Swiss-Prot record:
Similarity field: Belongs to the class-I pyridoxal-phosphate-dependent aminotransferase family.
Cofactor(s) named in the record: pyridoxal 5'-phosphate
Quaternary data: Homodimer.
Coiled-coil residues: none
GO CC field: cytoplasm
Modified residues (N6-(pyridoxal phosphate)lysine): K242
Pfam family, one: Aminotran_1_2
EC number of this enzyme: 2.6.1.-
Localization (cell): Cytoplasm
UniProt keyword list: Aminotransferase, Cytoplasm, Pyridoxal phosphate, Transferase
GO molecular function: pyridoxal phosphate binding; transaminase activity
Name of the protein this chain belongs to: Uncharacterized aminotransferase SSO0104
Superkingdom field: Archaea
Length: 401
C-alpha cells in the first residue's frame, strides 16, 4: 500500500542479505558461516556488569541523561588514548565523534559527502553494508580489485587517470585496509603510505574503516592510514562491537575538526546523540584496562578458529578452489570454479545444513558470482569442521552436475 508514498531515496535502500540469511537459519539445524558475529566467550561479561553497577550507583544522573551530540567529552578523550594504541597521534577530543556503531558512521559520512553521480572508489569485494549505504546516494562506483596485498594500487591510479581524462574527479575512496571484510586481506605499511600519496596527488578523501584493526592475530597490525595523514584527508572509523560488545552499539570517527562539526550538525537532526549509558560503560572499560587486557584472548580465540577453518577447507574443498588466509578479523573469502554461481547454490547448501554469504553481494557491480564469504568467529570449532564439510560436499556435488 505504501510504496507509492515512499521517497526516491527510500526506494534505493536494500535489505541486508546477511540478516535475511540469518532469518532463514533460525530454529533450523543449519550451521551458519554467514554472519559476522563476535564469539560471546570473548565478551567481558563480569567486568561490564561491575562497571554498569558502579555507574548506576555513582553516576546515574549523568549516564541516564541527554549528553553532547559529539559524545561525552571525557569519553572522547579516552578514545584519543585508545587510538594511540593504533598509532594515531596529533589529535584531541575535537577530532573525535561518537556514533551508534560504525554503521551509523558509514551512513552519516556518505550522506554528508556524496551527491548523485559522484565518483567513489571501492574495493572489489568490499563491505556490503557500506555499498548499500552508498547506493542511496546514487554515486558512480569505480571498483578496484583486491589482491592478496589489498587493493591493486596500480589499477587505482590507472582508473583515476581515466576518470580525470573524461573530466571526472574522484571524491572519495572507501577502504578497509586491515583484515578486510569480506576478503580478509591486510595492506602493508608501504602500500598505505602510497595510497595516501595517490589521494593527495589526485585530491580525494579516504574513508578508512578500521573495524578489525585491533584483531590482527598473526604478526603486528600495521598502523592505520590515518596515522600517516598530515593533510586531514583521511576520515577514520572504528567500533567497540569487535573489542567489547556489539550490543552496546558504539563506534567512533576521527577526522579533521571541520568535518566533525558537519557530523555534529547532521546527527543533531537524526538522533541527537549516542546513548549515554553505553558511552559511560565503554569509557570505564578503557580506563580500567578491560579492553586492552581482553584483546590477547580475542586474538587467541580467533586465530585458533581461523586455523580450524583453514585446515577444514584444505581437507574438504575441491582442488581448483582458492581462498584467502587472513592474518586477522573474522572471515575467509573463497573463489570457486567459474561454473558455480554461489547465489544459486545457496539453497542446496541450506538443504545440507550450512549457510554462507554469496560473494556477489560484496561487489558494486554484483560480479563475483563464483565467490563466497565464510565466517569463523562465531561458530564453535566442531561446527566449523562440520560446516565446511557440508559446504565442500555441496560444492563438489554442484561441480558434478
Amino acid at each position: 500500500m505504501f510504496e507509492r508514498f515512499l521517497s526516491t531515496e527510500t526506494k534505493y535502500l536494500r535489505t541486508s542479505e546477511i540478516r535475511d540469511l540469518l532469518k532463514l537459519t533460525e530454529g533450523k539445524n543449519v550451521i551458519s558461516l554467514a554472519g559476522g558475529l563476535p564469539d560471546p566467550q570473548t565478551f567481558p561479561v563480569e567486568e561490564i556488569k561491575k562497571i554498569a553497577d558502579d555507574i548506576l550507583l555513582n553516576s546515574a544522573d549523568k549516564a541516564l541523561q541527554y549528553t553532547a551530540t559529539a559524545g561525552i567529552s571525557e569519553f572522547r578523550r579516552e578514545l584519543v588514548n585508545l587510538s594511540r594504541l593504533r598509532g594515531i597521534s596529533g589529535i584531541d577530543e575535537r577530532n573525535v565523534f561518537v556514533t551508534v556503531g560504525s554503521q551509523e558512521a558509514l551512513f552519516m559520512i556518505f550522506n554528508i559527502l556524496l551527491d548523485p553521480g559522484d565518483n567513489v572508489v571501492v574495493e572489489a569485494p568490499t563491505y556490503l553494508a557500506a555499498l548499500n549505504a552508498m547506493r542511496t546516494r546514487k554515486p558512480n562506483f569505480i571498483s578496484i580489485t583486491v589482491t592478496e596485498m589489498g587493493p591493486d594500487l596500480d589499477e587505482l591510479e590507472r582508473k583515476i587517470k581515466d576518470a580525470h581524462s573524461n573530466g571526472k574527479k574522484v571524491k572519495l575512496m572507501y577502504v578497509i585496509p586491515t583484515a578486510q571484510n569480506p576478503a580478509g586481506t591486510t595492506m602493508n605499511t608501504e602500500d598505505r603510505k602510497r595510497l595516501l600519496e595517490i589521494a593527495s596527488k589526485y585530491d580525494f578523501l579516504i574513508f578508512e574503516d578500521d573495524a578489525y584493526g585491533f584483531l590482527v592475530f598473526e604478526g603486528e597490525s600495521p598502523p592505520p592510514i590515518k596515522a600517516f595523514d598530515k593533510e586531514g584527508r583521511v576520515i577514520y572509523t572504528s567500533t567497540f562491537s569487535k573489542i567489547l560488545a556489539p550490543g552496546l552499539r558504539l563506534g567512533w570517527v576521527i577526522a579533521h575538526e571541520d568535518f566533525i562539526k558537519e557530523m555534529e550538525l547532521y546527527k543533531q537532526n537524526v538522533d541527537l546523540h549516542t546513548p549515554s549509558l553505553s558511552q559511560y560503560i565503554a569509557m570505564e572499560a578503557i580506563r580500567r584496562g578491560i579492553i586492552q587486557n581482553n584483546l590477547p584472548k580475542i586474538r587467541r580465540v580467533y586465530k585458533e578458529k581461523r586455523d580450524v577453518m583453514l585446515e577444514a577447507i584444505e581437507t574438504y574443498f575441491p582442488n581448483d578452489a582458492r581462498w584467502t588466509k587472513p592474518v586477522g578479523g573474522m572471515f575467509v573469502f573463497a573463489w570457486l570454479p567459474q561454473k558455480i554461481d554461489t547465489t544459486k547454490m545457496l539453497e542446496k547448501a541450506l538443504q545440507r545444513g550450512v549457510a554462507y554469504v554469496p560473494g556477489s553481494s560484496f561487489y558494486a557491480d554484483y560480479s563475483g558470482k563464483n565467490t563466497m564469504r565464510i565466517n569463523f568467529s562465531f561458530p564453535k570449532k566442531e561446527e566449523l569442521i562440520e560446516g565446511i564439510k557440508r559446504l565442500g560436499d555441496t560444492i563438489k556435488h554442484e561441480l558434478s552436475t
